[in-house]
Amino acid sequence: MPSALESRLIDLESRLTHQEAMVDDLSDVIAAQDRTIARLVVQIRHLAGALRDVELGSIGSPADDKPPPHY
């Protein structure tokens, strides 16, 4: 039968092993989130540029505004 000190050491080693596995898992999650955030930033920049183009394209001079055909 292991002594109290040996039992504590085994318990600590077991906890350390679980913590190391958890740190590795969390690191993987963070890396995946970083990739997702980078992809979303690119998409937002693209959408912002497209929106800007639409806004600039829809702003014209009042002379360009023609009355609807039913007038």
Swiss-Prot record:
InterPro entries: SlyX. It comes from the Bacteria. Pfam families: SlyX. Gene3D superfamilies: 1.20.5.300. HAMAP family: SlyX (MF_00715). Belongs to the SlyX family. This is Protein SlyX homolog. The lineage of its organism: Bacteria, Pseudomonadati, Pseudomonadota, Alphaproteobacteria, Rhodospirillales.
